[in-house]
Amino acid sequence: MSVVSKNSYILFLFLLVLFFASCKSKKNLHKQNPVASVDTTVEKCHMEFKTGKALSKRMYDNELDFTYASAKFSCELTIDGDEKSFNVSVRCRKDSVIWLSISKLGIDAARVLITKDTVKFTLGLTEKKYFTGDFSYINQMLHADLDYDMLQALLFGNSSAFYDDDSKLKPGRDRNTCQYFLSTIRKNQLKRINSGQEPAGESYQTINLDPVTFKIIALDFTDIHAKRKFSASYTDFKSVDKYLAPFKLLYNITAEKNIKADIEYSKININEQQSFPFKIPASYERIQFKK
């Protein structure tokens, strides 16, 4: 990187946490993590979904749906033991634009504007810098496969299509917690991989669903070739209009750097029209990243 401040690097790592959580994989998937509370009506963990497509549909039917959304959250970001805390305001027009205002100690530190085609941000305070590019540029930088839909889904606890054909996904259910999960490998193979009895492929991941609400409660992704691991958990679900949304999100990345993001929403509102103010002052200096 050149002409890059520490704050701009941290902002990119923060976006990396958000993006990497939804990484697409056309390979295999991984195991379950947190324990969800199980309704007393779910007794024997009966597997009533015979196909991944059927279970995926139930998951999609219970996702947060909106035209506009706005939210506020606090974030504790830890990078190799170095902690940073900040607050974020989010505005979104579904499938169109995401706007982020990042502040520290009540002072506007950064603005981010993301569309299907562009990624822009400005750094305020003493930085007075800006970046403008697109997903192909960021994908090349981060060696990832990112897009707008992934970030939008992640911010609101929804799914992002991680496999081209839902009919090829394998459904499963944990006998202890009754959690459902979706994987591209079968349950017995997943157990052998987790126990070390069978080597994993190039990558594998899992989506875990609450057995009552069918909301996503955990994600796991391991990229063997790149030596990267990602895990996410979603808790503290609250009503947002007629939907449920997680108000606490925890992300962990193990790669060249160990990154943890602990996010807690204070509010989420939907279907109130939003504006997306974004301006690059003429005096700001453009940030240049080496490819």
Regions found by a protein language model. Name each.
Residues 97-150:
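An acidic-aromatic
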